[in-house]
Every structure is written in structure tokens, then in C-alpha cells.
């Protein structure tokens, strides 16, 4: 079995994602996947995720599109 080294990611989410429970859903999903990090709202309307996890978990984080239907862009 191959072990993946954790990497720190800063993910910036753009779209109509504030005041709709998006941050809380992402925090809950991260906890369920065993991802350590923080999710916070910025004044410019973006949501930023700073998290440390192995790259194979990134696919799981973004797999369920129902959590991201309001997302316009992710960087």
C-alpha cells in the first residue's frame, strides 16, 4: 500500500457561497474525511480553505458536487 504525504492546500472558492451554510458544510465534510484545516469567509465574498491532507483525499473532498453547486470558480 502506498502512503501519501500530507500537503498543505489553500483553496479559494468564488461564487454565491456566503450566508447559505457553505462553510459549515465544508467543515463537516472535512471532519468526516479526517481532514485537518480551517474554513473562513473573506470580506470580498470568497471562502478560503486552509487544510493539510494527502492528495488522494482531495478527490473525495470535491467528489460530491451537491456541496459545490453555488461555486463559480475554485483556485
UniProtKB/Swiss-Prot annotation:
GO terms for molecular function: acylphosphatase activity. Residues 8-75 form the Acylphosphatase-like domain. Pfam families: Acylphosphatase (PF00708). This is Acylphosphatase-like protein MJ1405.
